[in-house]
């Protein structure tokens, strides 16, 4: 299994055709997706475009849907929730479809939606994703960071390194296929004893701190190997728990 890491979706070659893709947005989309599905959401349907989201949501029964919208770290007006993993509790999301659009994560998902096996990862479901990849045994895996508005993201690279390192621990058949994957693994080794500190140090972590009290979000996003859920694309843009 060859592991490639791309810091942002635009770095992935246009002609790339990996057997599997793993999208990461630690702060906070893929963490929120994992917790929402763990807490019983029927599915998370991701959108890069807000008008597309609204149109799809309108076709869904009102009592079975929630709109999750975030731009610049803040909840969008008229949406039920923002992008906080601690807000997607069972009483709120169980049995519902979540129509979601965020600054970075859902756009990254849109870039790789044609890949045969598409999953999302965050620190809380790292082990589950690693085990799923080993079970499926794709020849090539593209880990795609969401970044921040097209630029490098420290926390996404941390999680990419955490996943790549765990895959290498579990199987000698796993190789790191580009320098970005090697660098991400080294980053994980540097911060693995205190991932929350890395998240807070990152520029997007600092952005969230300036926006207000996000301590619960930081703790949630930094929690390692807590979930068994693997959000998996079942149809274009639609992620369900597998």
From Swiss-Prot:
It is an enzyme of class 3 (hydrolase). It catalyses: (2R)-O-phospho-3-sulfolactate + H2O = (2R)-3-sulfolactate + phosphate. Its cofactor is Mg(2+). Its EC number is 3.1.3.71. It holds the Pfam family 2-ph_phosp. One of its GO terms (molecular function) is 2-phosphosulfolactate phosphatase activity. Keywords: Hydrolase, Magnesium. HAMAP family: ComB (MF_00490). This is Probable 2-phosphosulfolactate phosphatase. It comes from Parasynechococcus marenigrum (strain WH8102). The gene is comB.
